[in-house]
């Protein structure tokens, strides 16, 4: 028994009263609008049986098509009595929380409930002398006709209700799904009209399966949806489908003219390149350990490696990290020995996949770090990881009247915004860091109005152009701005006063990470997504405008459309060595 | 190790643990909880026998970011003579133990209709980070800069872990984990009743909780976020009253954070 029910609730009569009212309302609601969510009002584990039994009671007339119109029920259903003398048991047998998708909780529960009692009463039409005089010939008509309404009150008592069931419960943020397995239901029916008792009982038991398979889960789901939407009435999905089925479905054209016009020719070209790149007659296996085997395309399995190349503590301080890695390797070998394995066992180290953004201990001990560099890196990583998350900078007043309570003042949103912008300013204040991937930084911003507006506009432009990378592909977002920042003269400036005197590696996304350099990958990992121009392996298609302006300015001004322009690689067309293509503006006048 | 912490003193004094527990319990009671959580209590608290190692690495002028933040708040910045910033290496691999208990409540159809007791045991907390502590303009800023590599905390999993990293690729590298290792043990179900079973060690739930916890800390205290302790006297009574009126807000905010995290 995992859940504890409030004992008082069950000892108190008021709870039974509440249940009775809810049940009655539900039954009568159901009576009026057959087919709508039956018994949506009945709730709770306690009510499970009630609504089950009640719905079952309603079922036989409903299943006879059309019978519900001339319902034999002549009055509303009155629930006389509901009793829950014993506390139901609800026990969690297993629980599973999935982290990835929108919080989904799966549980297997055992429900058991006993000795419950429901008594309902209503009136039924039962004229045993009813004659269909209209359809019968005159000569057969008897003299005595009593075709008046003849209502008989009927009381049904379900007692010794006993339910045991194993249920699967799914909780999502949209509702609660439940399915019943292994239902064991037992009850005794006492009917005031003994004649009907066996018949009703038989029908009820026959319809139980449907109740637990269909009625109850949908009832609970609808109900939970109301909870999750905070009381907003949700239109039952059944109704929706009925409405939509009224209007004839128009056949929809796939890929009509307008759809095609949305695809930019540049995109189409890129897609076709992508497709054709996959077709190879090469007998050698495609290159390992390269970020892109296809020019300009980042493959899913290489995304991680691509991400690793962003400036971060582990590749910035890579020189020292190498030693650290060496030590780790030693440790690993010892680990392996502990596990009873020979040290030469080629188990792939995690290090090659799972890189933690840590400051190497050696760097810390040798004092060869710079706080400002670290802050810049961390700020940049923060910005890249969370675009929309507001910066948290709590202010706690220590001198307030109640010093014992830490009075947390949430920073107002406005301050938050400014805080965020301030921290992006940091990067621009540190020229050596040059982490600023935004085109906002002063040197390269051709539109002097600057500010966030310009940036937004720029982003919109990026989105307009078909070439924008998908959301989960954060790397490519930076491609164009980085390219824009690229000019060589800037690089020379990067030798900053802060790092003066010490030959620290440059902190710049443009530079190849030393970590990678030290790996000495035979395939030459430098795919230089960052620095196609510097690398000089590209032939930028000459365009008249390009000559007059700086590339960055060009991108910013009318960067409506970026196109993929072919590239020549100077590695004898061997795959695996191709740097990705430059993104460049296709000359389309606005 | 710059700070010599006489941890034995703490251990010898058994009242310290109790007092800390009492204080934390008091704080927990004052929290305004969402309606579906009740009775949150700290049932056990042990500081442990292993002290944190705190090393002072650098004393410097405060970073410009702090001044910038103050300036944006509209505070006038006075002389900078007394402003100072410490860079500290915090290394904690102790055996602190926290036991929390709470009850999840279903308030339908009647209030407090159904409860689910949950017990959490938190231990094995491992931190090795650089922490920036700046004091300027009578305000204290605390922010965790970055993690420091530590063989004891890196790659905690054994090399034989079958949950291969092959699909880790989707995740970008986190800038800081702050809490490098944490162990959360869960128990679901009432402790005292003998009937029925107690669901123990729900792995996924533990993972989920530790993620929520880590994310919360990362969001609140890791650079470029920070915690700002203001030692200034309140300027006027108005400010004070408004701040005390807002007192409940951050907690609710926290709860929303939590649920938002849970949904995310």
Swiss-Prot record, chain A:
Write out the annotated subcellular location.
Mitochondrion outer membrane
List the keywords (alphabetical).
Lipid transport, Lipid-binding, Membrane, Mitochondrion, Mitochondrion outer membrane, Transmembrane, Transmembrane beta strand, Transport
Which residues lie in Polar residues bias regions? 413-427
Skewed-composition ranges (Basic residues): 393-405
User: Cross-referenced InterPro entries, in alphabetical order?
Assistant: Mdm34 (IPR027536), SMP_LBD (IPR031468)
Give the start-end ranges of region Disordered: 393-456
**What does UniProt give as GO cellular component?**
ERMES complex
Query: Where are the coiled-coil regions?
Result: none
Single annotated GO MF = lipid binding
> Which comment does the entry carry about domains?
Lacks alpha-helical transmembrane segments, suggesting that it resides in the membrane via beta-sheet conformations similar to those predicted for other outer membrane proteins and porin.
Q: Member of which family?
A: Belongs to the MDM34 family.
Q: What does this protein do?
A: Component of the ERMES/MDM complex, which serves as a molecular tether to connect the endoplasmic reticulum (ER) and mitochondria. Components of this complex are involved in the control of mitochondrial shape and protein biogenesis, and function in nonvesicular lipid trafficking between the ER and mitochondria. MDM34 is required for the interaction of the ER-resident membrane protein MMM1 and the outer mitochondrial membrane-resident beta-barrel protein MDM10.
Assembly notes: Component of the ER-mitochondria encounter structure (ERMES) or MDM complex, composed of MMM1, MDM10, MDM12 and MDM34.
Q: What is this protein called?
A: Mitochondrial distribution and morphology protein 34
Q: What species does this protein belong to? A: Eremothecium gossypii (strain ATCC 10895 / CBS 109.51 / FGSC 9923 / NRRL Y-1056)
From Swiss-Prot, chain B:
* One annotated Gene Ontology cellular component of this protein: endoplasmic reticulum membrane
Q: Which InterPro entries match?
A: Mdm12, MMM1_dom, SMP_LBD
Task: Name the UniProt key words of this record, in alphabetical order.
Answer: Endoplasmic reticulum, Lipid transport, Lipid-binding, Membrane, Mitochondrion, Mitochondrion outer membrane, Transport
Q: What is its main location?
A: mitochondrion
Question: Domain SMP-LTD: where?
Answer: 1-232
Mitochondrion is among the record's keywords:
yes
UniProt entry tagged with the keyword Acyltransferase? no
Under the heading PROSITE patterns, the entry gives: SMP (PS51847)
Q: What does this protein do?
A: Component of the ERMES/MDM complex, which serves as a molecular tether to connect the endoplasmic reticulum (ER) and mitochondria. Components of this complex are involved in the control of mitochondrial shape and protein biogenesis, and function in nonvesicular lipid trafficking between the ER and mitochondria. MDM12 is required for the interaction of the ER-resident membrane protein MMM1 and the outer mitochondrial membrane-resident beta-barrel protein MDM10.
What is the official name of this protein in its record? Mitochondrial distribution and morphology protein 12
């Amino acid at each position: 028994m995992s859940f504890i029910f409030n004992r008082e609730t069950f000892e108190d009569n008021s709870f039974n009263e509440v249940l009775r009212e809810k049940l009655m309302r539900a039954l009568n609601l159901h009576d009026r609008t057959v087919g709508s969510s039956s018994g949506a009002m009945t709730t709770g584990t306690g009510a499970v049986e009630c609504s089950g039994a009640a719905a079952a009671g309603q079922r036989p007339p409903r299943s006879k098509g059309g019978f519900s119109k001339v319902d034999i029920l002549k009055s509303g259903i009155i629930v006389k009595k509901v009793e829950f003398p014993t506390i139901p048991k609800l026990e969690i047998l297993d629980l599973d929380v999935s982290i990835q998708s929108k919080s989904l909780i799966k549980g297997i529960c055992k429900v058991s409930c006993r000795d419950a009692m429901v008594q309902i009463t209503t009136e039924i039409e039962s004229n045993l002398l009813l004659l269909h005089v209209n359809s019968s010939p005159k000569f057969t008509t008897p003299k005595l006709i009593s075709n008046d309404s003849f209502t008989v009150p009927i009381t049904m008592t379900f007692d010794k209700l006993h339910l045991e069931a194993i249920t699967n419960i799914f909780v999502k943020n949209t509702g609660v799904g439940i399915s019943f397995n292994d239902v064991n239901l037992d009850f005794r029916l006492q009917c005031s009209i003994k004649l009907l008792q066996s018949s009703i009982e038989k029908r009820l038991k026959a319809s139980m399966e449907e109740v637990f398979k269909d009625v109850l889960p949908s009832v609970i789901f609808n109900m939970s949806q109301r909870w999750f939407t905070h009381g907003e009435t949700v239109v039952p999905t059944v109704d929706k489908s009925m409405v939509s089925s009224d209007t004839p479905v128009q056949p929809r054209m796939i890929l009509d003219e307008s759809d095609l016009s949305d695809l930019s020719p540049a995109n189409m070209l890129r897609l076709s390149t992508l497709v054709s790149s996959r077709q190879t007659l090469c007998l050698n296996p495609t290159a390992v350990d390269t970020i892109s085997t296809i020019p300009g395309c980042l493959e899913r399995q290489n995304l991680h490696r691509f991400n690793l190349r962003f400036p971060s503590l582990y590749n910035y301080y890579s020189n020292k990290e190498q030693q650290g890695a060496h030590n780790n390797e030693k440790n690993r070998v010892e680990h392996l020995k502990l596990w009873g394995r020979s040290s030469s066992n080629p188990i792939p180290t995690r290090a090659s996949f799972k890189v933690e953004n840590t400051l190497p201990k050696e760097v810390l001990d040798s004092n060869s770090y710079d706080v400002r560099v670290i802050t810049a890196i961390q700020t940049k990583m923060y910005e890249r990881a969370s675009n929309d998350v507001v910066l948290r900078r709590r202010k706690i007043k220590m001198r307030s009247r109640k010093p014992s309570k830490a009075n947390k003042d949430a920073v107002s949103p406005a301050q938050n915004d400014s805080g965020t912008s301030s921290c992006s300013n940091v990067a621009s204040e540190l020229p050596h860091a040059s982490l600023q991937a935004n085109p906002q930084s002063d040197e390269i911003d051709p539109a002097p109005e600057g500010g966030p507006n310009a940036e937004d506009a720029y982003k919109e432009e990026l989105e307009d152009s078909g070439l924008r990378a998908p959301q989960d592909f954060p790397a490519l977002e930076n491609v164009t701005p980085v390219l824009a920042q690229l000019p060589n003269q800037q690089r020379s400036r990067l030798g900053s006063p802060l790092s003066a005197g010490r030959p620290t590696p440059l902190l710049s996304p443009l530079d190849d990470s030393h970590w990678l350099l030290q790996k000495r990958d035979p395939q030459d990992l430098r795919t230089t997504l960052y620095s196609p121009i510097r690398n000089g392996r590209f032939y930028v298609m000459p365009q008249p405008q390009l000559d007059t302006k700086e590339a960055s300015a060009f991108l910013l001004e009318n960067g409506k459309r970026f196109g993929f322009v072919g590239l020549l690689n100077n590695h004898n067309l061997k795959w695996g060595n191709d740097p990705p293509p430059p993104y460049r503006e296709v000359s389309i006048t606005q | 190790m710059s700070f010599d912490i006489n941890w034995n003193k703490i251990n010898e004094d058994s009242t310290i643990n109790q007092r800390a527990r009492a204080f934390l319990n008091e704080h927990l009671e004052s929290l305004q909880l969402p309606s579906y959580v009740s009775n949150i209590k700290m049932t056990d608290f042990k500081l442990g026998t292993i002290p944190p190692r705190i090393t002072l690495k650098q004393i410097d002028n405060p970073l410009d970011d702090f001044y910038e933040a103050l300036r944006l708040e509209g505070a006038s910045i006075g002389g900078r003579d007394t402003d100072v910033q410490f860079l500290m290496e915090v290394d904690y691999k102790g055996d602190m133990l926290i036991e929390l208990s709470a009850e999840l409540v279903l308030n339908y159809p009647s209030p407090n209709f159904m409860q689910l007791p949950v017990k959490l045991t938190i231990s094995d907390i491992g931190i090795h980070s650089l922490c920036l502590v700046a004091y300027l303009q009578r305000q204290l800023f605390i922010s965790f800069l970055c993690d420091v590599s530590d063989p004891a905390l890196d790659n905690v999993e054994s090399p034989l872990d079958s949950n291969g990293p092959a699909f880790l690729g989707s995740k970008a590298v986190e800038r800081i984990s702050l809490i490098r290792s944490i162990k959360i043990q869960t128990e679901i179900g009432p402790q005292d009743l003998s009937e029925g079973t107690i669901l123990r060690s729900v792995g996924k739930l533990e993972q989920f909780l530790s993620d929520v916890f880590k994310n919360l800390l990362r969001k609140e205290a890791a650079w470029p976020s920070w915690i700002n302790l203001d030692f200034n006297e309140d300027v006027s009574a108005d400010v004070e009253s408004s701040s005390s009126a807002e007192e409940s807000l951050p907690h609710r905010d926290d709860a929303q954070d939590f649920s938002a995290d849970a949904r995310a």
